[in-house]
């Protein structure tokens, strides 16, 4: 089993509140891993530690064998949605992605347009983001996460604001990405409804992570 992400004894507190309580888990490469749990259960904090945005109090995080905070500061070739993307409302969806792509020389116009098309926003790419619905902004965030064609995707609540059809289309996109070798970690309140999508489902509860489903 090749590990995409490995966390060892991951512990994080804020003041007297211990949010992560010594989590150890391996997320296998090339699979879709669902993490469910209520608000405040620790899902987002774990994702931020994996992405290098938060430093754990104890423990370690490895992404494809490289230790975060020691070998590298942030995971390489990784697309992520950890918080609501801060898109500029007065320019179009395409212009927002083009602006963000300037930070990465690997992303050109072809990658931007392909990402927009894959999330079903092609007809709205010239529309100002301020006129987007919540679901459209969520899909634009997913387009941002995939436009580098990443090896790893980390997505916190990627189905927020999506209607049933939109969620289905996004799920189909995730399956397509997995088939091409992308590892996906996604958090939601209840991913048990998507057993068909996820290869494994873990539950985060009171700072502990437990596997509840595995194909």
Functional labels for PLM-detected ranges:
Residues 51:
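Helix-to-loop junction immediately C-terminal to a conserved catalytic motif
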Residues 188-189:
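H-loop/switch region of ABC-family ATPase nucleotide-binding domains
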Residues 36-38:
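The feature captures the beta-strand-to-loop junction immediately N-terminal to the Walker
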Residues 98, 109-124:
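Conserved ABC ATPase "signature" region
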Residues 153-156:
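Catalytic Walker B motif of ABC-type/P-loop ATPase nucleotide-binding domains
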Residues 59-74:
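Conserved ABC transporter NBD signature motif
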